[in-house]
Structure formats: C-alpha cells, structure tokens
C-alpha cells in the first residue's frame, strides 16, 4: 500500500553500490512468493526501481473485479497488457492482450480489472515519477503517495516476510 506520510527517501545502498549499467530482470509469474501484495486482489512483481526519476517498472497482476484506488501520475506511464482485460473507469476503452497504453501525467483514473476478464490481468507498467492517490474521484483530496522508493520498501518488506533474499531487489535499483 502506498505511503501516507513522508520521510527522507533512501534506497538503502551504500554510496557507490548502486549499479549504473544495463541489466535484465527475470520474472517468474508462476512463483506466488514473488508477487508482492499491493491492493485487494492486486499484486506486483518488481522489475526496476529508478531512484533518479523515482519511477519503477513492475508486472501487475489483478483478479477479475479488482481495482486500484483513484490516482494520478506526476510523470508518464507506459503499459502493455500480457493477459486479461482491464480498463480505467473514466474511459470507454478496454485493454486486452496486446494493448499498449501511454498516459501523460496528471489525469486522475481508476484501474479496474473487468469482471468478465477470462483470467487475471497481467500488465507490464513502466512508471516515471510518483503516483498521487486521492480519497475520491470527483474532487479528491490527497490520500497517499507512491513512488520508486515506497515501492522498493513495500517489496523489501514482503521479501523479508516471505523468506526471500532482499538483496535480489538491490540488483533492480538504478
């Protein structure tokens, strides 16, 4: 779940320990331990944490009917649908396997996996900058904030609780 108060953001690595080179991240959609709980019926699997832009890249898995709270992005977002059906309540389109989306910053929307999705949705999201969650879609006030640092901490906490090696996440920090 996103943070609701701020403190000094730090990726926890010693100076010089963060790799600057290119890399690959191998995901395993069948390994349930790697899925980090994010919201009711929604999980993420991390691919990259960009501490320069405070962005992050994740696989998002959502069960039919699951939704994320209304939010907007302070940077652009790119997404690619691998399986399942999903949409934003505020739009008429439905994303299906093969759908690519590009979101400019600043539009409030609510991600919903459609009730009639034939399987859980699996979406690759590349998020530049943070997300601002709102308490309601009409004239919403600030409810929570999410970015690469808070996503990293959420993943670290899950890895510790699941008995996974937290250092695996350090390799995803750029």
What annotation goes with each model-predicted range?
Residues 1-54, 139-142, 153-174:
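A short, N-terminal "cap"/entry segment at the start of jelly-roll beta-barrel domains
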Residues 46-53, 66, 72-76:
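Active-site region of the double-stranded beta-helix
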Residues 58-60, 68-73, 90-93, 112-115:
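Short histidine-centered beta-strand/loop micro-motifs
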């Amino acid at each position: 779940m996103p943070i609701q108060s701020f403190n000094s953001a730090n990726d926890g690595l010693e100076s010089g320990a963060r790799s600057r080179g290119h890399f690959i991240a191998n995901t395993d959609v069948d390994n349930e331990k790697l899925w980090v709980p994010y919201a009711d019926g929604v999980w993420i699997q991390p691919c990259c944490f960009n501490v320069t832009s405070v962005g992050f890249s994740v696989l998002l898995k959502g069960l039919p009917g699951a939704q994320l709270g209304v939010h907007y992005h302070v940077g652009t977002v790119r997404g690619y649908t691998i399986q399942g059906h999903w949409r934003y309540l505020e739009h008429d389109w439905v994303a299906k396997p093969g759908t690519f989306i590009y979101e400019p910053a600043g539009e409030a929307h609510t991600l919903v996996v459609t009730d009639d999705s034939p399987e859980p949705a699996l979406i690759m999201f590349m998020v530049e900058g943070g997300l601002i969650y709102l308490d309601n879609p009409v004239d919403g006030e600030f409810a929570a904030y999410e970015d690469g640092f808070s996503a990293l901490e959420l993943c670290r906490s899950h890895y510790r609780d699941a008995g996974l090696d937290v250092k695996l996440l350090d390799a995803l920090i750029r």
